[in-house]
């Protein structure tokens, strides 16, 4: 997964597993999820990434930084060396059929936005080893399930689904009776994600928010459905 060397040596997950990764707010859950997504893509598998708090742009920026080795802070500010611009341009081009041909027509360091516009208009995304980011601030379990089923057809090599993060996924669009983090709902979400992993034969990774002691309320119920929990 790419969490750390010891963890990767200790666990061997199957395509039907549910793994949850816990941390406090602001302690790197999304960074860990992005790192796992990039590692899966590097291994030749497509990844579907559901995000609730951040939209597609910052998620893809993090993935691009990790994949190219370009520091995220300078990538965001566009304060880059020409060789770094070339690596970023190649990363984007590699996601599209015919992307390298489009890249050859542009000086990415001077015209990245125009290059990106031409790339997305002239080329289609590849149907393999893809990173697909789905942003929905009102994400529900039903939406996750329907989207994964659709994308499994679009990307036959879909190997990982990431949900960032479990605490904020809802069963349906109606507001929770007990507030945003109603624990019985979280238990049902956990069970639903495990059922999805088994039904679609994909590894499902979900971040979850913990308290300062590294625990989540009624965590035993949530963890009953998971194959591994990492905090």
Regions found by a protein language model. Give the residues of each.
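Conserved Walker B
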Residues: 166
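Cytosolic-facing regulatory segments adjacent to core modules
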Residues: 4, 8-10, 42-156, 214, ...
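Flexible beta-alpha connector loops of hexameric P-loop NTPases
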Residues: 77-80, 132-136, 171-187
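Walker A/P-loop NTP-binding motif
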Residues: 35-43
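Phosphate-binding/switch region of NTP-binding enzymes
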Residues: 26, 184-231
């Amino acid at each position: 997964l790419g969490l750390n060397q010891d963890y990767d040596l200790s666990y061997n997950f199957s395509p039907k597993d549910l793994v949850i990764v816990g941390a406090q707010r602001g302690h790197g859950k999304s960074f860990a999820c992005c790192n796992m997504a990039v590692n899966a893509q590097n291994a030749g598998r497509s990844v579907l990434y559901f995000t609730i708090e951040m939209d597609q742009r910052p998620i893809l920026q993090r993935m691009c930084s990790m994949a190219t080795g370009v520091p995220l802070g300078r990538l965001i500010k566009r304060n880059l060396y020409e060789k770094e611009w070339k690596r970023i341009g190649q990363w984007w081009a590699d996601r599209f059929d015919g992307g390298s041909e489009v890249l050859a027509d542009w000086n990415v360091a001077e015209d990245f936005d125009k290059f990106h516009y031409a790339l997305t208009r002239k080329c289609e995304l590849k149907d393999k080893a893809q990173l697909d980011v789905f942003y929905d601030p009102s994400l529900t379990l039903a939406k996750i399930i329907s989207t994964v089923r659709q994308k499994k057809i679009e990307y036959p090599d879909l190997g990982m689904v990431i949900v960032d993060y479990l605490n904020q996924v809802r069963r349906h669009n109606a507001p929770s009776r007990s507030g945003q983090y109603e624990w019985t709902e979280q238990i049902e979400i956990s069970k639903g994600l495990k059922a999805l992993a088994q039904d679609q034969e994909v590894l499902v990774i979900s971040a979850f928010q913990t308290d300062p002691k590294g625990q989540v309320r009624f965590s035993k119920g949530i963890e009953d459905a998971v194959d591994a929990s990492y905090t």
